[in-house]
């Protein structure tokens, strides 16, 4: 596996996770 594609995959996972956490926190409040 290429290191660049691996870095992109990690970046997308972190971005999606943080985005869902923000939406979750706002709906929770």
From Swiss-Prot:
The protein's UniProt keywords, in alphabetical order, are: Chloroplast, Electron transport, Membrane, Photosynthesis, Plastid, Thylakoid, Transmembrane, Transmembrane helix, Transport
Q: Where can this protein be found?
A: Plastid, Chloroplast thylakoid membrane
**Topology within the bilayer:** Single-pass membrane protein
Q: Where are the transmembrane segments?
A: 3-23
Instruction: Please list the GO biological process terms of this entry.
Output: cytochrome complex assembly; photosynthesis
UniProt key word Membrane: yes
Q: Which SUPFAM superfamilies match?
A: PetN subunit of the cytochrome b6f complex
Naming one, the record's GO cellular component terms include:
cytochrome b6f complex
| Predominant location category | plastid
GO terms of molecular function: electron transporter, transferring electrons within cytochrome b6/f complex of photosystem II activity
Source domain of life is Eukaryota
> In UniProt terms, what function does this protein have?
Component of the cytochrome b6-f complex, which mediates electron transfer between photosystem II (PSII) and photosystem I (PSI), cyclic electron flow around PSI, and state transitions.
- Family assignment from sequence similarity: Belongs to the PetN family.
Assembly: The 4 large subunits of the cytochrome b6-f complex are cytochrome b6, subunit IV (17 kDa polypeptide, PetD), cytochrome f and the Rieske protein, while the 4 small subunits are PetG, PetL, PetM and PetN. The complex functions as a dimer.
Extract the HAMAP family matched here.
Cytb6_f_PetN
Q: What is this protein called?
A: Cytochrome b6-f complex subunit 8
